[in-house]
Each structure stands twice: as structure tokens, then as C-alpha cells.
Amino acid sequence: MPLPDFHSSDPFTLGIELELQVVNPPGYDLSQDSSALIAAVKNDIKAGEVKHDITESMLEIATGVCQNIDQAAAQFSAMQQAILRAAGDQHIQIAGGGTHPFQKWQRQEVCDDERYNHNLELFGYLILQATVFGQHVHVGCRNGDDAIYLLHGLSRFVPHFIALSASSPYMQGSDTKFASSRLNIFSGFPDNGKMPWVSNWQGFEGLFRRLSYTSMIDTIKDVHWDIRPSPHFGTVEVRVMDTPLTLAHAINIAGLIQATAHWLLTERPYKHQEQDYLLYKFNRFQACRYGLDGLLTDVNTGEQKTIAEDMKWLLDRVAPSAEKLGGASAIAEIALMLKQGKSEAQRMRDFIADGGSLISLVQKHCELWATHP
């Protein structure tokens, strides 16, 4: 299918997608009941969307086009209430987090969807292993060239977004030693990681045309880069975050991304070049492995600092943009999190260290999602 023209969007409009865990108490393993839950709530959703993801244990919620994080929060809050009512009727529960700590991928069932079944045939067990849960944030752009500039600009802060959202230290019943183990699941896919280098939209059109020669890429949905342009929406989509444990934290992360996008496209602080990506995988690994304590290495100077230190610098830079966009509260909440020094991944490990079980950890996450907006 040919790549569509880039749809011009109002700059800095916002859309958020969250992949949630559908959980079956009292054992708190993943359920296979998302289809029944979606059927029960779809007529109650007035703004945004509730839909399938890859397997029957995954529930995706997505806002519509929002001007600011307050609009997104209101839409998610309404969805949350509808989902909790239906889940209660069906005796299932909902949790955030980038991975379920002890589910087995062999037990997962792919949704009855033509695209997902095609991917199961193509990728085999990799699709079932991709029963992991992420947050995606779309930011509107005026044109394709702006989208490519923004994509490269946001790529500089991929470690920050990973570390800020990291909530997947446990997988398959084990402590992975990673703050975010979720992203490792995608390493077997041919389109994992950063987008190949292009400098403008014309270059991207050529890139997509060549990718389509493989017969594995038909639409932009078939590429799973860390950040990708979405021409049909007129957005740039950031895809590296674990799903946070609360809607509030997800909203704050989206607010940071929106403010960073505004700063990047308004100030144009960087002249992007291909060598900017030479240490991309190393810095990304540091974020996945160590979270906010990970070390960033500057590709030009070799200077190193922790992600937490550099995050404080970023918050200062984007604060005026956040103020203009109505997202100052997100910056303040993230600054408070940095001051407290505890990520969601660390709080999970603390819970287990204090004698909690993985089952009780999932139970706690379900309670957290149900009681926090």
C-alpha cells in the first residue's frame, strides 16, 4: 500500500494510547477475556476508544485528539469508570505496568483479528511473547518535514522517556535486573529500535518505499520503531514507554513529551545529523537496565551524567512550553518524582524485598489502577 501524504494537524495536539493488563483474580494471572470486556464497554465510551491489542489479555485505551493534558485526563477518567464497572461485573481486574510479572507467553491467545493472525503466522512465538504493555504518545505536526525534525529531536530523549516510565522489572516469574525489560522483547523483530536515518519527508517516502519491497511492510503500522511518523494522523508517535501504574503518571509523561515537542519545534535547538545516533543503543540500554540511574554518554564530548541529572536539565528547558500548553502540572509532578528518587520499578522491588509475593504485587497494581485517576 502506498504511503499516504502527511495529514496536516494542529501543532502540538495530543493523543495517548495505553495497553493495560486484564487480570483474573484470585490468582492474578492474565485473563483471556478482553473481547468480552470490550463488548461490554464500547457503547459507554463517548470520547476516545477502547479496543483490542495483540492478545486476549491486553486492553488498549486511547484518547481522541486533545489540546492539552487536562482533556486527555478527562477522557481517560471516563473510560476508567466504564471499564471498572464492566470488569467488576465480569469478575476481572485491570492493572498497569510494562509486563505482567509471572505470566507465561505460551498461554496467550491472539485476538481474532486478520492483522494479528497474519503477524502470528509471520513472526511465530515472537507475537505471543509481545504480550507486554506500553504507552504511546502522538504529537500533532503541521507537515512531514516538521515531523522528521521532531522525530530526531525526541530521539535524543528516548532514554529519559524509558527511565521515567520504567515499570517492568519482573518477567516470567523472575527479577530481570532491568528497570524496563519490556523493550527487550522486541529485539527479535527486524524493525526494532531507531528509524533508519532520513533528513526530511521526501527521504522518508523513499525509505518506506524500499521497506515495502520486503513484502513485510504494507502500512506504517507494520513498523515498530521507537518513534515513528504517522502520516494518516499527522503526528509523531513516541512508543518506548512502559505503561505506568496510574493514569496520572501516564498523563504526566505525555505532558512532558508534548512540552518537549513544543520546545524542539519552536526553538529548533539542534541541527540533526546521522552521527547523533552513534551511541543511541548504548544510552537506550542504560535506561532500560538502570532506569533513572543509567548513564548517558554525550556522542560529541564523551561527557557522562545520569539520566536523572539530565532530566532536570530537560525539565528546565521545556517548562515555558509546558506553561503555554497548560501542562505545567506534569513538569512539577515529574520534578517531585525525581526529588523523591523512587521510580515505579524500584517501588516494585521494594515491595518484594519487604516480603511481598508476585501475586500480591499484581493485586496491589490492580488496586492502584482502580483507585487512582
Swiss-Prot record:
The keyword Protein transport does not apply. One of its GO terms (biological process) is modified amino acid biosynthetic process. Its EC number is 6.3.2.2. It comes from the Bacteria. Keywords: ATP-binding, Ligase, Nucleotide-binding. Disulfide bonds: none annotated. One of its GO terms (molecular function) is glutamate-cysteine ligase activity. The keyword ATP-binding applies. Signal peptide: none annotated. It catalyses: L-cysteine + L-glutamate + ATP = gamma-L-glutamyl-L-cysteine + ADP + phosphate + H(+). InterPro entries: GCL_type2/YbdK_subfam (IPR050141), GCS2 (IPR006336), Gln_synth/guanido_kin_cat_dom (IPR014746), YbdK (IPR011793). It holds the Pfam family GCS2. SUPFAM superfamilies: Glutamine synthetase/guanido kinase (SSF55931). PANTHER family: GLUTAMATE--CYSTEINE LIGASE 2-RELATED. Belongs to the glutamate--cysteine ligase type 2 family. YbdK subfamily. Homodimer. ATP-dependent carboxylate-amine ligase which exhibits weak glutamate--cysteine ligase activity. This is Putative glutamate--cysteine ligase 2. The lineage of its organism: Bacteria, Pseudomonadati, Pseudomonadota, Gammaproteobacteria, Enterobacterales.
